[in-house]
Structure formats: structure tokens, C-alpha cells
């Protein structure tokens, strides 16, 4: 197996296969569950809006794919600074049966100089999650400034995040290697049990390999696993299956 094929295989096993569109329906989520069961093995998780968790759970159970985790989003996509609402949404997501919650950090508040609200929001949402995995989306493409990306990562980890994630996929700049370097470095300094999730903009096996390479260089080859590394993506899967010669070449897409 070539290095590119190895990267494609790994990326599938590390993927949060995602649909977070305004026109999502039960049928689109059912289709996503079927796609997550790939000829190259199951993806790590699917990521969907909270209201679709019950139909996703039913579908994955019917497919015998109980190992696929169900992730959802809260305080999404704008990263508002209302802690009470973020906590209520997170509690509701857990009550719906989410295995993992991806919450958006109040990044605009941080850009305006308010560090405390981000810390308090993540801390409160982690308490609401209990054993459910909490991934914190810092929206690195909007923060842009390396110092802000670093600070959002530090605050999230200090507040109890299980993962830090680059992006919502709803802004012009999503996952970048530059942001990955900063975020993975903070993990190496603070707590290597915290995971990293580049999301949006990873289009093919070569780009996936680049992100995996940065993680391995900073944290070691043994660090990367579904417990510590995920790709958030919608259009990436078809490209990876094509690399593995298990699907036709993907059509051009505007997908996440």
C-alpha cells in the first residue's frame, strides 16, 4: 500500500463524517449513516444537528454500526457568549443521546479582549456533558492571529475540553496547517490526552497526510488515534475512497 493509500485509510478511520446544512432532513442523515459504513471500514463518527440524533441512532443500530459515535453541535455556528444558552443546548444534546458534543467557543468575545467568558462557557458545558466527549471549536480562521489561536486553545484545555477543533466549516477560512501547528503545540505543552480536530477544507488524502504529519511530528506517531485525532469533513470521504480505488472520482463540490 502506498503512503497516500495508507493516509487515506487512516483518515477514514479518524473521520467525523458531517452534515450540518440548513436543508438537512431525516433522509439525508439516514444516507449519511449508510455512507459512514464504508468499504474501507467505518468512520469514527458522524456529526449532525441534535434533532437528528434519534434517527441516526436507529439507523446505525440497524446497520450493526454501533461503534460509530454520534457527534452534534451546540452554540453553533456563531459562538455566542451566552453561557446559559450554550449549557442548555449542550444538556439537550446529551439528553438526545449524543456521544460527543462540538461546542463553539465565544471567539468574538476573545477577539474583543474577554478571556473569562470562553473559559467559563467551556467549563460549564463540560460539566453538562459529564462523560460525553466535548470538542471545542475555536474558529481559528476568524481568530487568524496566532496569539489568539494559541489563547483560545489554552483556555479551552484549561476549562476541560477533551478536543480542540479548528472550525465550524461555516466561515471562509477553515482548517489550516498553520493553525494545526499552534493548536497541537498547545496540546503538547498542556495535556497530551486532549485531542485535535481539523475541520473543513481537507479535500484529499494528500492534505489529510499533511495534517497527520504535523500531529506525528509534534506529538509522536503513537499519539494519533480516534481518541485524539479526528477529521471533520463531508466531501473528503469520496476522495479517500477514490484514492483507495473503492469509488469513482468525486464530483467537484462546495462541501465542508
Curated annotation (Swiss-Prot):
Class in the EC hierarchy, top level: lyase
One Gene Ontology MF term: deoxyribose-phosphate aldolase activity
GO biological process: 2-deoxyribose 1-phosphate catabolic process; carbohydrate catabolic process; deoxyribonucleotide catabolic process
Leader peptide range in chain numbering: none
Keyword Cytoplasm attached: yes
Primary site of residence: cytoplasm
Keywords recorded for this protein, A-Z: Cytoplasm, Lyase, Schiff base
Pathway this chain belongs to: Carbohydrate degradation; 2-deoxy-D-ribose 1-phosphate degradation; D-glyceraldehyde 3-phosphate and acetaldehyde from 2-deoxy-alpha-D-ribose 1-phosphate: step 2/2
Positions of the catalytic residues: 102, 165, 197
UniProt subcellular location: Cytoplasm
Cellular component terms (Gene Ontology): cytoplasm
Pfam families per the UniProt record, alphabetical: DeoC
Catalytic activity reported: 2-deoxy-D-ribose 5-phosphate = D-glyceraldehyde 3-phosphate + acetaldehyde
Enzyme Commission number: 4.1.2.4
Annotated HAMAP family: DeoC_type2
Known role: Catalyzes a reversible aldol reaction between acetaldehyde and D-glyceraldehyde 3-phosphate to generate 2-deoxy-D-ribose 5-phosphate.
Family of the protein in this entry: Belongs to the DeoC/FbaB aldolase family. DeoC type 2 subfamily.
Protein name: Deoxyribose-phosphate aldolase
Gene that this sequence comes from: deoC
